[in-house]
From Swiss-Prot:
<dbReference type="GO" id="GO:0070125">
    <property type="term" value="P:mitochondrial translational elongation"/>
</dbReference>
<keyword id="KW-0496">Mitochondrion</keyword>
<dbReference type="Pfam" id="PF00889">
    <property type="entry name" value="EF_TS"/>
</dbReference>
<dbReference type="GO" id="GO:0005739">
    <property type="term" value="C:mitochondrion"/>
</dbReference>
<comment type="function">
    <text>Associates with the EF-Tu.GDP complex and induces the exchange of GDP to GTP. It remains bound to the aminoacyl-tRNA.EF-Tu.GTP complex up to the GTP hydrolysis stage on the ribosome.</text>
</comment>
<dbReference type="InterPro" id="IPR018101">
    <property type="entry name" value="Transl_elong_Ts_CS"/>
</dbReference>
<dbReference type="InterPro" id="IPR014039">
    <property type="entry name" value="Transl_elong_EFTs/EF1B_dimer"/>
</dbReference>
<dbReference type="InterPro" id="IPR001816">
    <property type="entry name" value="Transl_elong_EFTs/EF1B"/>
</dbReference>
<feature type="transit peptide" description="Mitochondrion">
    <location>
        <begin position="1"/>
        <end position="47"/>
    </location>
</feature>
<dbReference type="GO" id="GO:0003746">
    <property type="term" value="F:translation elongation factor activity"/>
</dbReference>
<keyword id="KW-0251">Elongation factor</keyword>
<dbReference type="InterPro" id="IPR009060">
    <property type="entry name" value="UBA-like_sf"/>
</dbReference>
<protein>
    <recommendedName>
        <fullName>Elongation factor Ts, mitochondrial</fullName>
    </recommendedName>
</protein>
<comment type="similarity">
    <text>Belongs to the EF-Ts family.</text>
</comment>
<keyword id="KW-0809">Transit peptide</keyword>
<dbReference type="InterPro" id="IPR036402">
    <property type="entry name" value="EF-Ts_dimer_sf"/>
</dbReference>
<keyword id="KW-0648">Protein biosynthesis</keyword>
Length: 354
């Protein structure tokens, strides 16, 4: 029976699942991608006839694009194992997916901070949900962009804002920042936006200290919903650099915790002071709220201000310390967040049903 069936099949050309034809040679079914042997014991065995192993290509494509394994495999199959065409195919697929989520509100997210050898970057990256923003994939993207920025030529000698769309391509993968975001959107199925970036390069500036802090319950100090960078300068003497670094870090923590807006009284806009006076508010009350140097220092002694603490530590270290600048980020600040009132929604439905 087996022989007669095989004889009949050998006279036929059968279509396979992808529409190409199967032919027979030496009792075997043959096509471009697979064959199976028909044994007398009626066992069927499938073999790959594709000489090129996909595993190394999939690995390379994953490194380039961070796309899921199944997407990398599909891209290679669709493009006949051409790695460049497969990369372009995945980028186009990612853009198509990202466009579907582009109009969704992004008010959650994370603050990422990287400080290394006198250089520092702080950025805010937003997502739709807090769940995604706390995930490893989202934070890895924020870290990757932070470090790409740190190694770029966009950093100034003073703390300054950088436009997100000017950040250089990520050298390790050859992808732009936009490509990295698109790939992650396709993977997480949520809209993602790089909202803002500040950075400084003080690596060649003498007597300058930079520090950063992100408030994270897990204790990483790199990611959180609040973060800050601060720049200090010192003049004279040979102070303990470790002590200066600790002071800068403590001030960065204070900035995150208390939330000042300006370094000194002199930097407060006149319009803000006029508004306080018009509202019969004492200027000192305003300064306590918005001026860093006038605030009670959270790491200080005997209820001292930040200014008093800096003066005290300057004397201890026999140098003159100045807070030059700082920046503070809070996730979603200034953005309108939709608040769901499910109770009101239920009552509205009940009233409509009456």
């Amino acid at each position: 029976m087996m022989r007669s069936t095989l004889s009949l099949l050998q006279k036929c050309r059968l279509p396979n699942n992808n529409g190409s034809l199967l032919s027979f040679k030496n009792n075997q079914v043959v096509n471009q991608t697979a064959l199976f042997s028909m044994k007398s014991n009626q066992q069927y065995r499938f073999y790959s006839t594709d000489v090129k192993d996909l595993a190394p290509l999939i690995k390379e494509l994953r490194n380039r694009t961070s796309a899921p394994l199944k997407d990398c495999k599909e891209a290679l199959i669709q493009n006949k194992n051409d790695i460049e065409k497969a990369t372009s195919w995945l980028h186009e697929k990612g853009k198509s997916t990202a466009n579907k989520f582009a109009d969704r509100a992004v008010v959650e997210g994370t603050i990422s901070i990287v400080v290394n050898n006198g250089k520092a970057v702080i950025l805010e990256m937003n997502s739709e949900t807090d769940f995604v923003s706390r995930g490893e994939t989202f934070r890895a993207l924020a870290d990757q962009i932070s470090r790409a920025t740190l190694e770029s030529n966009l950093l100034a000698q003073s703390l300054a804002e950088i436009k997100p769309d000017t950040i250089a391509p990520q050298p390790a993968s050859g992808s732009t920042v936009a490509d990295l975001i698109v790939g992650t959107v396709a993977k997480l199925r949520e809209n993602i936006r790089l909202r803002r970036v500040h950075a400084i390069d003080a690596s060649n500036q003498p007597n300058t200290i930079v520090a950063g802090y992100a408030h994270d319950p897990s204790g990483t100090n790199q990611f959180g919903r609040l973060g800050s960078l601060v720049q200090l300068q010192y003049e004279g003497g040979q102070p303990d650099i470790a002590a200066l670094n600790q002071l800068a870090r403590n001030i960065a923590v204070h900035i995150v915790g208390v939330g000042p807006s300006y370094v000194s009284i002199e930097s407060v806009p006149k319009v803000l002071l006029d508004e306080a006076i018009a509202n019969k508010r004492h200027p000192n009350s305003l300064y306590d709220e918005v001026v860093l140097l006038e605030q009670k220092y959270i790491s200080g002694e005997d209820n001292e201000t930040v200014k008093a603490a800096v003066q005290r530590i300057s004397k201890q270290l026999k140098t003159n310390i100045t807070i030059k600048s700082f920046v503070r980020y809070s996730v979603g600040e200034g953005m309108e967040k939709k608040v769901e009132n499910y109770g009101a929604e239920v009552m509205e439905k009940i009233n409509k049903a009456k």
